[in-house]
């Protein structure tokens, strides 16, 4: 278990000014979990993850790994503790003049040459590149380089793997393959994985729980499904919208598209299905039941933490009292209703 309590880490911008990269952050990550920490650039997420293995030593606070206070360890004890915390980065950090085998073998100590070769081959098989041991980094694709980095991070059989923007330099297809590999490793090895990213798609794809950071603080945390389906903080809502086709409505409004020009009395709203049990044809039913027109402008369905999350942007047309009853009907069905534009009541 990873337990961070009241972590503070500052950097001096100049003589008289310091910046709180991490400001009073507390976080608990359970064994075997895949936990995401997401935030825009400068939010403090990379500094926070480096506090876990004390690559960045906090100014104050507590860092406990499986009940052991990392801040109080002596240098030799800290070195030993770090061998059980693997880490991968955006830029892979491979040594270009060494083969894949030599790169992966680098952290291994106290083993014979044959034992090292056997261990490296086992790791390369685990990350699905068993035929690359004699290749050099320049001969590998970005995805293959990250697989080598993962193999090296696993060399000492760690319990924890820290991933700092590990897919940011990869194309979407390769990103998906690396995320699937991390999920497989979590299942096979029982690894606790901490994922640092600015991409909500990554969190949605791999994480079970997540925390959202902004200006050095955690502004929202919990189950990924709850964060996606019912974000509470404006920053979180912005992140969620970047992953949904429903966010295109803002572009259509900004461009004054004829698709979204409302007539007097019309209401444009975003409907978000926040529970997995919504299966009725609710648009057509509400249209008939309340005798109003409901026109679908955009629609989207996503799988988040194994659960379907759907949404639509619609325009209601009809008597105001009936529109309001229809929106209340949706709320009663556990559908979140967000009014985007309201053309007012017809005189």
Where in the sequence are the language-model features?
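Helix-to-loop junction immediately C-terminal to a conserved catalytic motif
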Residues: 53
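Conserved ABC ATPase "signature" region
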Residues: 68-69, 114-131
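ABC ATPase NBD coupling module
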Residues: 70-86, 110-113, 117, 227-231
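Short coil-to-helix segment of the ABC ATPase nucleotide-binding domain corresponding to the Q-loop/switch region
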Residues: 98-105
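Conserved signature/switch motifs of ABC ATPase nucleotide-binding domains
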Residues: 135-138, 156, 163
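A short, surface-exposed alpha-helical micro-motif characterized by mixed small hydrophobic
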Residues: 203-205
């Amino acid at each position: 278990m990873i337990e961070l309590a009241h972590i503070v880490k500052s950097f001096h911008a100049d003589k008289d000014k310091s910046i709180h990269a991490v400001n009073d952050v507390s976080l608990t990550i359970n064994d075997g979990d895949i936990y995401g920490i997401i935030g825009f650039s400068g939010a403090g997420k990379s500094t926070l993850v480096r506090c876990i293995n004390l690559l960045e030593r906090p100014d104050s606070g507590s860092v406990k790994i499986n009940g052991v206070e990392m801040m109080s360890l002596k240098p030799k004890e800290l070195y030993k503790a770090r061998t059980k915390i693997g880490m991968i980065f955006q830029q892979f950090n491979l040594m270009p003049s060494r083969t894949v085998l030599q790169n992966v073998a680098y952290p291994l100590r106290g083993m014979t040459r044959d034992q090292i070769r056997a261990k490296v081959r086992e790791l390369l098989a685990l990350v699905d590149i068993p035929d690359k041991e004699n290749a050099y980094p320049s001969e590998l694709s970005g995805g293959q380089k990250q697989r080598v980095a993962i193999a090296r991070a696993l060399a000492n059989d760690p319990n924890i793997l820290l991933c700092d923007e590990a897919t940011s330099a990869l194309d979407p297809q390769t990103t998906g393959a690396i995320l699937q590999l991390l999920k497989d490793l979590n299942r096979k090895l029982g690894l606790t994985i901490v994922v640092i990213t600015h991409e909500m798609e990554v969190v949605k794809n791999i994480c079970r729980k997540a925390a959202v950071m902004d200006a050095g603080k955690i502004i929202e945390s919990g189950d990924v499904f709850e964060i996606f389906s019912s974000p509470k903080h404006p920053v979180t809502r912005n992140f969620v919208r970047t992953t949904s086709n429903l966010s295109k409505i803002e572009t259509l409004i900004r461009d004054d598209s004829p698709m979204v020009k409302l007539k007097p009395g019309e209401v444009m709203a975003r409907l978000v299905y926040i529970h997995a049990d919504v299966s009725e044809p609710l648009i057509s039913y509400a249209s008939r039941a309340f005798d109003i027109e409901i026109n679908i402008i955009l629609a989207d369905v996503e799988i988040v933490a194994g659960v379907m999350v759907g949404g639509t942007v619609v325009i209601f047309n009809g008597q105001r009292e009936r529109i309001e009853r229809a929106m209340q009907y949706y709320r009663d069905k556990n559908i979140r209703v967000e009014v985007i534009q309201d053309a007012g009541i017809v005189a």
